[in-house]
UniProtKB/Swiss-Prot annotation:
The lineage of its organism: Bacteria, Bacillati, Bacillota, Clostridia, Eubacteriales. One of its GO terms (biological process) is translation. This is Large ribosomal subunit protein uL5. Gene3D superfamilies: 3.30.1440.10. GO terms for cellular component: ribonucleoprotein complex; ribosome. It comes from Ruminiclostridium cellulolyticum (strain ATCC 35319 / DSM 5812 / JCM 6584 / H10).
């Protein structure tokens, strides 16, 4: 069992039961999945950029990403339907807990001038979204082998019914929210 899953079962879940007065253990919110998405806009000029992005995301998550394609053509962006425009990974189970543990304890503290994550990024249904400006904060990425800095979106999908429950869950798992 991963360290973060153990922390959830032994510390976070009992604390949530106590705070929100759940009558059943099954009502306790849990982390369902984590979705990482990386848009690769420069792929229309440089076809090799997609390989680099896929490789980076594979190193970061330990799982091969799926390549996303354009749903429709947009002339202003010189985009045709079916062109590769990014990649995404959905993490569940132990891989998800290992990634979240690494993100909270290793990657996020490496961000320069980091003062905590905004607590305004909840969607109203208990899911949290955040963005990362470059992939160098992850220890698996070697600085010398990076051709271009690429950011990514990370979405934490929980079974929580409200943002308050989801925020408490993520806080108990170790997400560093800002104090304001």
């Amino acid at each position: 069992m991963t360290r973060l899953k153990d922390k959830y079962l032994n510390e976070a879940a009992p604390a949530l039961i106590e705070k929100f007065k759940y009558s059943s253990r099954m009502q306790v919110p849990k982390l369902e999945k984590v979705v990482l998405n990386m848009g690769v806009g420069e792929v229309k000029d440089n076809p090799k950029a997609m390989d680099s992005a896929v490789n980076d995301m594979t190193l970061i998550t330990g799982q091969k990403p799926i390549v996303t394609k354009a749903k429709k053509s947009v002339a202003a962006f010189k985009l045709r339907q079916g062109m590769n425009i990014g990649c995404k990974v959905t993490l569940r189970g132990d891989r998800m807990y290992e990634f979240v543990d690494k993100l909270f304890n290793v990657a996020i503290p490496r961000v320069r001038d980091f003062r905590g994550l905004s607590s305004n990024s909840f969607d109203g249904r208990g899911n949290y979204s955040m963005g990362i400006k470059d992939q160098l904060i992850f220890p698996e990425i070697e600085y010398d082998k990076v051709d271009k800095l690429r950011g990514m979106d990370i979405v934490f999908v929980t079974t929580a019914k409200s943002d308050e429950e989801a925020k408490e869950l993520l806080k108990l798992l170790g997400m560093p929210f800002s104090q304001n």
